[in-house]
Swiss-Prot record:
Keywords: Calcium, Lectin, Manganese, Mannose-binding, Metal-binding, Toxin. Mn(2+) binds at residues 8, 10, 19, 24, 34. This is Lectin alpha chain. Binds one manganese (or another transition metal) ion and one calcium ion. The metal ions are essential for the saccharide-binding and cell-agglutinating activities. Is being tested as a molluscicide with potential application in controlling schistosomiasis. The causative agent of schistosomiasis depends on freshwater snails of the genus Biomphalaria as hosts during its larval stages.
Length: 237
């Protein structure tokens, strides 16, 4: 099975798998059952921003979700990613819909990682930034239903030609280049990721959510990982 660390924007509470009984953001370490959650005042039809950061000195993974003109939501969890993830990984975004649905539109996405060792010369870093997504992106690996539209947006799940979200959809987008996320001799391994998103839904209860995730380089959508499993995990264990 894939090794996954994720930050989830979970729009639909699945209390049977340990979700709190409201939309929330959460940090997932190798399981859909979040290690830490915070209530998320989701605003459909408004562009939101997510900022995720990790620093191997503090060993803290944190995420902040905000909408213009309203207060932000923060979640954090103390974890040493050296003990969880392989040395080389890929970073991605995933989303699902189920019986209920929503658009899972990504408007921009940036990522920076730095790996500092004792040697001044030896710094591994990776940076990418998408402010628009091209129609046939060479620098993204699109999985499942994910596609880029003519407006320069990344749609992680299916939408109709008129822009309406479709149910029972799962899609992911990964940056093509692997990331050197840690190394035994590294003094500091850190990363920052930011993306902007737009969730719209005709349903009273939108579903299911969007994630930023880090996984082994050969990661693929697990069978049966739709809906509440957010395209990341084969089961709810």
């Amino acid at each position: 099975a894939d090794t996954i660390v994720a930050v989830e924007l979970d729009s639909y509470p699945n209390t049977d798998i340990g979700d709190p009984n409201y939309p929330h953001i959460g940090i997932d370490i190798k399981s859909i059952r979040s290690k830490s959650t915070a209530r998320w005042n989701m605003q459909t039809g408004k562009v939101g921003t997510v900022h995720i950061s990790y620093n191997s000195v503090a060993k803290r993974l944190s995420a902040v979700v905000s909408y213009s003109g309203s207060s932000s939501t923060t979640v954090s969890y103390d974890v040493d990613l050296n003990n969880v993830l392989p040395e080389w990984v890929r970073v991605g975004l995933s989303a699902t819909t189920g019986l209920y649905k929503e658009t899972n539109t990504i408007l921009s996405w940036s990522f920076t990682s730095k790996l500092k060792t004792n040697s001044i010369a030896d710094e591994n870093s990776l940076h990418f930034s998408f402010h628009k997504f091209s129609q046939n992106p060479k620098d993204l690996i699109l999985q499942g239903d994910a596609f880029t539209d003519s407006d320069g947006n990344l749609e992680l799940t299916k939408v109709s030609s008129s822009g309406d979200p479709q149910g029972n959809s799962v899609g992911r987008a990964l940056f093509y280049a692997p990331v050197h996320i840690w190394e035994s001799s590294a003094v500091v391994a850190s990363f920052d990721a930011t993306f902007t998103f737009l969730i719209k839904s005709p349903d009273r209860e939108p579903a299911d959510g969007i994630t930023f995730f880090i996984a082994n380089t050969d990661t693929s959508i697990p069978s049966g990982s739709g809906g509440r499993l957010l395209g990341l995990f084969p089961d709810a264990n």
